[in-house]
Design a protein with these regions (language model features):
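N-terminal pre-domain/capping segments
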Residues: 1-90
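Acidic (Asp/Glu)-rich catalytic clusters
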Residues: 23-30, 44-64, 90-99, 130-137, ...
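Conserved, mostly hydrophobic/aromatic
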Residues: 26, 34, 66, 84, ...
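Active-site acidic/histidine proton-transfer and metal-coordination neighborhood
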Residues: 58, 74-173
């Protein structure tokens, strides 16, 4: 990536039509990326992916995807475990056919296991995922996401560690989830800087040139995330966050997950350009 691009989680709300029309509308809005939302189902066929690929290339839109919500790589139920792996693999297959760049997902829950045992289970599952993905795409990034609840696997350190130990894996950094997961921490300039410093320390400067970021407003409590909000209604200091991203010359994509996806995406893009 040569710069930091802004876009929407899914096709813009104001889109009239399908994913292809969503890509065209993202370009009309002056945004540069879009996340394919497979959160409830992988809803793009192989045939449709060819059309999505063509539209994204023509409009110069970078595509990412969010794999289904039903993933729990730490499930003791073997059927759910293997289904979770397949959700990620199949999301990557379709995203690859769409000429997508990155696949993010929530890896699972600690349940009754220790954090270390959960880590090892998730790591073993992800090894299987990467082995499969390499058969059809050796460049697409597989990205476990920082999660928003303390019951979920996915702290910053866990995600960095997976990225250190597995090929083709990098973090998806959700700053709203960091805020919610820590019940209000990581919301000042020094704290935002500490996140980027931790990533660079663990994964090198290249990691800051290759970031898949989620930003939204968020409501949270003691156990973490409750729901997403528009930025202006949230405690997240998104202005300071964008300032830090600009100062550090971070490159990659910022996907807006606020309820008003295109409005907040354009708000962030315009603010970022002013710094």
């Amino acid at each position: 990536m040569d710069s930091l691009l802004f876009g929407t989680a899914g096709k813009p709300i104001s889109t009239k039509g399908d994913t292809v029309e969503g890509i065209k509308h993202v370009r009309r809005l002056g945004l540069d990326c879009m996340e394919l939302e497979f959160v409830h189902s992988i809803n793009i066929t192989k045939e449709k992916a060819i059309l999505v690929n063509k539209a994204a290339k023509e409009k110069k839109i970078i595509l990412t995807c969010h794999a289904p919500f039903y993933i729990n790589i730490n499930s003791i139920d073997k059927k759910k475990f293997h289904a979770s792996l397949n959700y990620i693999i199949n999301s990557a297959k379709i995203t690859s056919l769409c000429n997508g760049w990155s696949v993010c997902f929530h890896a699972g829950f600690y349940q009754k296991d220790t954090k270390e045992k959960t880590y090892e289970t998730v790591k073993e599952g992800m090894k299987k995922i990467i082995d499969e993905v390499k058969n059809f795409d050796k460049k697409i990034w597989i990205r476990p996401e920082i999660s928003g609840k303390i019951s979920q696997f996915g702290s910053l350190n866990e995600i960095i560690r997976l990225s250190q130990e597995l090929e083709q894996v990098m973090p998806c950094v959700d700053f709203a989830h960091m805020l919610a997961r820590t019940n209000g921490k990581y919301n000042t300039k020094p704290e935002f800087i500490s996140i980027l410093d931790e990533i660079e320390k663990g994964l090198g400067k290249e990691a800051l040139n290759n970031m898949h970021i989620h930003i939204s407003g968020i409501e949270y409590g003691e156990i973490g995330e409750r729901n997403h909000l528009i930025l202006e209604h949230s405690k997240l200091d998104y202005k300071e966050l964008l300032n830090v991203l600009k100062e550090y010359k971070v490159k990659g994509v910022v996907i807006c997950e606020s309820p008003n996806i295109e409005e907040d995406a354009m708000l962030m893009q315009n603010l970022y350009k002013k710094f």
